[in-house]
């Protein structure tokens, strides 16, 4: 599965270190997520989807629809 996290980050001219800070993880670990060397934890996928304003499905490459799903509650 090809993640879109690198494209989303680069489209916003952000550095890996900046996104790693959002996730509260090390930059080298985040880099491994971008290169698909380690699986992206669901908690991080959810956090990144909220950060970028996209759905988790879009982030994971399962749909081409960027819009996030409406939140319940």
Question: Can you say where each PLM-predicted feature lies in the sequence?
Answer:
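A short, Lys/Arg-rich alpha-helix, primarily the initiator
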Residues: 1-11
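Residue-level detection of the helix-turn-helix DNA-binding "recognition helix"
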Residues: 10, 24, 35-37, 64
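DNA major-groove recognition helix of helix-turn-helix/homeodomain DNA-binding modules
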Residues: 24, 43-58
